[in-house]
């Protein structure tokens, strides 16, 4: 799984600017639910072959004992507790503040790896920017400018020096060649109940294997003589015990589990409907390209009218996930839970499918013969052949000419054709267009030799005589 970097510091030291630099995007997921502050952002980035997850916390005010600032401090400490590396950010222009000393003392007690980051140091010599922050006793400071992007590569390289490259990450327990299932969803939708039902229903063989991320557990189990790995983000208790409190929710763990899985079971609450946080999690699943099964829980206790109304609402709001199978279940009573596993198997098979190039090309050419792409100006785009470029999710690469002019509607037409023909149900499908390189594009023709110029002149004279 990706290592987690948590940005901590007092207000207005440039945490959000640094976050946007590290993720190269302003479209971070925002956790806007009770128990998590509004300005906690989650995003992921990559330095070369090293991926990472970044958490941007609110301004840390540890001395405040009540109100919203106290809640923000509590949530910041919770984020630190989930961190692999804490980036403690201070303001190089304002210098060392008393609040920085208090925060440093708080962070030192956590036992996490802490990197002191002196921000807003553009145009300042290293010695000038860093000298007074040695007093904090957190080691040699990293001096950066988030605004101008200065020295950020060195910062991330230092932060990730103890973590493996992408190739090594793929060798983790969650990446073995059998279905790896993550149960995702917001709090109180019944994730824990579903996990216990899955592990207890068929007297499955279960044993706990510590994961590479703190508090995540890989549970290997057998169902129908097939092996699976279930990623439990909340820390699964033995099935004989009762869940005493509302299941713990960690956005970081949820995102990491989604990325580590082959198939995600997204659990929704039939009685409370789809929330904004449900949409955030679904969007992240779609972005990462993981196969998906949707379990709409708490179906018991609803009359026929409520069920009919709820079905229509979910089908309308989940139209952007129309590739996934929907199941209406009661995790508490086990109703409909058995039907989840065949959908998980089908989604896994589709996500890991290997499609031969000749078959892909034949299907693509048949789709083009049935409906050609619209003209993009003077010429019509020409699709020549297709091949598979990846799995989990399947990536189909189409080669041809003038493909930059293929509209989005035609791309969806090809995507739906590939999905229907090759039965890729339960997984996102990505179609990428690549135009062949023209080595002469943008180049002028070489000058004619004397003999070539004489012959061209003769041809022009003959044509004038012939056609007047």
From Swiss-Prot:
Residue ranges constituting the EngA-type G domain according to the UniProt record: 3-167, 179-352
Region Disordered, residue ranges: 434-468
GO MF annotation terms: ATP hydrolysis activity; GTP binding; ribosome binding
Keyword Plastid: no
SMART domains for this protein: AAA
Biological process terms in GO annotation: ribosome biogenesis
Sites where the protein binds GTP 2: 185-192, 232-236, 297-300
Keyword Nucleotide-binding: yes
Binding site for GTP 1: 9-16, 56-60, 119-122
InterPro entries: AAA+_ATPase, G_ENGA, GTP-bd, GTPase_Der, KH_dom-like, KH_dom-like_a/b, P-loop_NTPase, Small_GTP-bd
Gene3D superfamilies in the record: 3.30.300.20, P-loop containing nucleotide triphosphate hydrolases (3.40.50.300)
Keyword list, A-Z: GTP-binding, Nucleotide-binding, Repeat, Ribosome biogenesis
Stretches assigned to the KH-like domain: 353-437
Comp. bias intervals (Basic residues): 456-468
Annotated PANTHER family: GTPASE DER
Function: GTPase that plays an essential role in the late steps of ribosome biogenesis.
Oligomeric form and interacting partners: Associates with the 50S ribosomal subunit.
Family label: Belongs to the TRAFAC class TrmE-Era-EngA-EngB-Septin-like GTPase superfamily. EngA (Der) GTPase family.
The protein's name in its UniProt record: GTPase Der
Source organism (scientific name): Nitrosomonas eutropha (strain DSM 101675 / C91 / Nm57)
Source taxonomy: Bacteria, Pseudomonadati, Pseudomonadota, Betaproteobacteria, Nitrosomonadales
């Amino acid at each position: 799984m990706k290592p987690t970097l948590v940005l901590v510091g007092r207000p207005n030291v440039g945490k959000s600017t640094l976050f946007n630099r590290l993720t190269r995007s302003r479209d971070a997921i925002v956790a806007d639910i009770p128990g998590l502050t509004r300005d906690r952002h989650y995003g992921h980035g990559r330095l070369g072959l090293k991926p990472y997850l970044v958490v941007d916390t609110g301004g840390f005010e540890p001395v405040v004992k009540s109100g919203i600032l106290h809640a923000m401090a509590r949530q910041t400490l919770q984020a630190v507790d989930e961190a692999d590396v804490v980036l403690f950010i201070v303001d190089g222009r304002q210098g060392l503040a008393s609040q920085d000393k208090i925060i440093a003392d708080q962070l030192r007690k956590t036992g996490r790896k802490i990197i002191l980051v002196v921000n807003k140091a553009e145009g300042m010599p290293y010695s000038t920017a860093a000298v007074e922050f040695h007093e904090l006793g957190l080691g040699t400071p990293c001096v950066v400018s988030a605004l101008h992007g200065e020295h950020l590569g060195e910062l991330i390289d230092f932060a990730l020096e103890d973590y493996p490259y992408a190739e090594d990450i793929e060798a983790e327990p969650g990446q073995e060649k059998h279905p790896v299932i993550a149960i995702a969803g917001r709090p109180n939708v019944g994730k824990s109940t579903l996990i216990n039902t899955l592990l207890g229903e068929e007297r499955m063989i279960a044993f706990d294997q510590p994961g590479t991320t703190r508090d995540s557990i890989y549970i290997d189990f057998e169902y129908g003589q097939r092996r699976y790995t279930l990623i439990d983000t909340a820390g699964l208790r033995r099935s004989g015990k009762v869940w005493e409190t509302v299941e713990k929710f960690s956005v970081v763990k949820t995102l990491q589990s989604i990325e580590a899985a082959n198939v995600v079971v997204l659990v929704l609450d039939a009685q409370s409907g789809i929330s904004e946080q449900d949409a955030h999690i679904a969007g992240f699943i779609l972005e990462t390209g993981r196969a998906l099964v949707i379990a709409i829980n708490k179906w018991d206790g609803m009359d026929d009218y409520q069920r009919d109304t709820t079905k229509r609402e979910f089908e309308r709001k989940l139209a952007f996930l129309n590739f996934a199978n929907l199941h209406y279940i009661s995790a508490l009573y086990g109703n409909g839970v058995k039907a989840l596993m065949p959908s998980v198997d089908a989604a896994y098979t589709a996500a890991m499918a290997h499609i031969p190039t000749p078959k892909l090309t034949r299907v693509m050419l048949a789709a083009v013969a049935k409906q050609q792409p619209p003209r993009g100006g003077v010429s019509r785009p020409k699709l020549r052949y297709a091949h598979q470029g990846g799995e989990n999710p399947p990536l189909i690469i189409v080669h041809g000419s003038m493909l930059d002019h293929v509209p989005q509607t035609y791309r969806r037409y090809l995507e739906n054709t590939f999905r229907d023909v090759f039965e890729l149900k339960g997984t996102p499908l990505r179609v990428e267009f690549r135009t062949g390189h023209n080595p002469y594009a943008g180049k002028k023709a070489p000058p004619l030799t004397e003999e070539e110029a004489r012959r061209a002149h003769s041809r022009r004279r003959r044509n004038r005589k012939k056609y007047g």
